[in-house]
């Protein structure tokens, strides 16, 4: 009886985005089977750009450069949440739209995830704090030092 060689599992690269109008977090994760590996993470600082239109331009440029550099198979984006400040929600929606446009410009599929679903998946608690999410991700990806900004 001959043995059939097992096909190696395909690696999938995912660009995760946490859009914001002052700070935008991102991470590049390679997934093989059910095992994720952190490739890169960071934040895009937008506070130094006073004009909202310029912030949107920078979001587009940076997300596009991440897509072109890492060539992700997929983009995971935090879906909008509902807040009381309409102006803030409008600005956040624009930031999310621009990030989506940059990925779609290179034909990378996008999936939006509700913040509570992300927290539930990472920590087991949909109401977890950013600190709790960061702590769990540090354990999963063996990150020694907690990032200064928890949007990363």
Regions found by a protein language model. Give the residues of each.
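Phosphate- and other anionic-substrate recognition elements at nucleic-acid/protein interfaces
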Residues: 1-152
């Amino acid at each position: 009886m001959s043995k059939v060689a097992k096909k190696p599992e395909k690696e999938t690269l995912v660009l995760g985005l946490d859009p914001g109008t002052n700070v935008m977090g991102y991470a590049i994760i390679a997934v093989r089977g059910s095992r994720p590996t952190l490739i890169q993470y960071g934040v895009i600082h937008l506070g130094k750009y006073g004009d909202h239109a310029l912030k949107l331009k920078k979001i587009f440029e940076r997300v596009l450069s991440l897509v072109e550099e890492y060539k992700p198979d997929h983009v995971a984006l935090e879906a909008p949440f509902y807040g009381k400040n309409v102006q803030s929600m409008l600005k956040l929606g624009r930031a999310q739209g621009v990030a989506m446009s940059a990925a779609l410009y290179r034909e990378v599929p996008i999936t939006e995830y509700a913040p509570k679903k992300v927290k539930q998946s990472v920590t087991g608690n949909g109401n977890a704090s950013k600190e709790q999410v960061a702590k769990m991700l540090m354990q999963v990806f063996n990150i020694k030092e907690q990032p200064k900004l928890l949007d990363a």
